[in-house]
Amino acid sequence: MQRKVSEINNRMRVSFDLDEVLFVSPKTHKTEPPLHFPFNRIYKERLRLGTPDLINELQELGYEVWVYTSSFRSEEYIVRLFRHYHVKFDGIVNGTRHLKEVQRNNATTLPQKLPNRYHISLHIDDEEIGCKLAGQYGYNVYQLEAQDDDWKEKIIAHAAKIREREHKD
């Protein structure tokens, strides 16, 4: 099925932080099975259980899915790691890109993430400070906290509410 160009350009964007959101510790969270050797030596991060399903489902529902992280992992590293889980992001903003495109030469230190600068409608994060700044800087955020077996359903529902609200405007 081919989509019209205007439909693709108007797709709502959802972004995820990496650390403590998609990458979690198996000591505190349920995780996807580790990658097989030798990839488990290259990519030591463990994915929160359900991450590939959630990202692929969001894309099937018509959302663009991005990574927006303050980490300085390269875009290439992120792409290759997630390829092993059959996940392809629509966009990636890492710490390097954020500094170059958002912070630039601004004398005032801006927050580590400003999702609305990339037309991201919903950002998923664990950091309380980023969530508190959302109202001040005009972006929507869903704070993902501890282990939550229903996290996928909650994020899909939250994204649907925002998409509905945006279509009313």
Role assignments for model-derived ranges:
Residues 1-101:
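Alpha-helical substrate-recognition element adjacent to the catalytic core
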Residues 8-9, 61-63, 72-169:
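C-terminal cap/substrate-recognition subdomain and adjoining C-terminal extension
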